A protein has these predicted regions:
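Short helix-to-loop capping/linker segments positioned immediately adjacent to catalytic or ligand/cofactor-binding
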Residues: 50-52, 108-115, 150-151
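A domain-level detector for eukaryotic transcription factor DNA-interaction modules
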Residues: 144
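Short solvent-exposed loop/turn micro-motifs enriched in small/polar/acidic residues
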Residues: 44-45, 118-120, 157
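Short hydrophobic/aromatic patches at helix-to-coil boundaries
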Residues: 192-195
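Catalytic core of tubulin tyrosine ligase-like
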Residues: 147
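Short beta-strand edge/turn micro-motifs at domain boundaries
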Residues: 2-8, 13-15, 21, 134-140, ...
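Short, low-complexity N-terminal intrinsically disordered segments enriched in polar/charged residues
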Residues: 2-68, 75
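A solvent-exposed, acidic/Ser-Thr-rich amphipathic alpha-helical stretch
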Residues: 68-139
Length: 195
């Protein structure tokens, strides 16, 4: 904190932060439309199930959570509004995700000898929008993922934004956006699987 102005004996303070980096970040709405406890619970259960499936390395089940046109996007910065023509940590459609799943589960995948272990924690689940006609929802949440491999522990944290389509089989992911706290940081080795 730094003093910005003095008025008599009172001093007003303003946070000293990197205004340029903060100013261009998109800000999600602070409040949401009223949603039923049942809808909130259904969305939370979906996100918790996704985290458990990822931790168990059940790639086929995880891929089945996506629509056929689904995308998984992890931009480098929160200010990115378009995945096309800009660097991304991940920008994959379902076909590319299938290729990655086969690669990391292949018996000769050196990068997975030994395989990594992960633990996902998802919280702060907020339904931002509900389409009254289709039942589709946009949801934001926070996550923390811990990865352990070869005596190295790595932590990834940030925000998820899911665009979920309501189908006869339940919700399916049309878009999952992952904004890492340290998305523009350096990594000592490549992120092998999804966050």
């Amino acid at each position: 904190m730094r003093a910005t102005e003095k008025s008599g004996s009172a001093t007003q303070y303003a946070e000293d932060f990197d205004g340029a980096a903060q100013a261009d970040r998109p800000r999600p709405p602070l409040l949401v439309a009223d949603v039923s406890p049942e809808l909130q619970h259904a969305v939370e259960r979906f996100l918790y199930r996704q985290a458990e499936i990822l931790d168990d390395r059940r790639w086929d089940e995880w891929l089945a959570l996506f629509t056929e046109t689904g995308k998984y996007w992890a931009p480098v910065t929160e200010s990115q509004t378009d995945a096309e023509g800009a660097p991304s940590i991940f920008y994959e459609d379902v076909d590319l995700m299938r290729v990655r799943a086969k690669r990391v589960s292949h018996p000769r995948a050196w990068s997975q000898k030994p395989p990594h272990r992960t633990s996902h924690v998802v919280g702060g689940v907020v339904v931002e929008k509900v389409d009254a006609e289709t039942g589709d929802v946009v949801v934001r949440s926070k996550f923390h993922m811990t990865e352990f491999r070869r005596d190295q522990l790595r932590h990834f944290a940030g925000k998820y934004r899911h665009h979920l389509k309501k189908t006869a089989a339940g919700y399916r992911i049309e878009l999952q956006r992952v904004d890492l706290v340290n998305g523009d940081g350096t990594y000592d080795y490549v992120i092998q699987t999804w966050l």
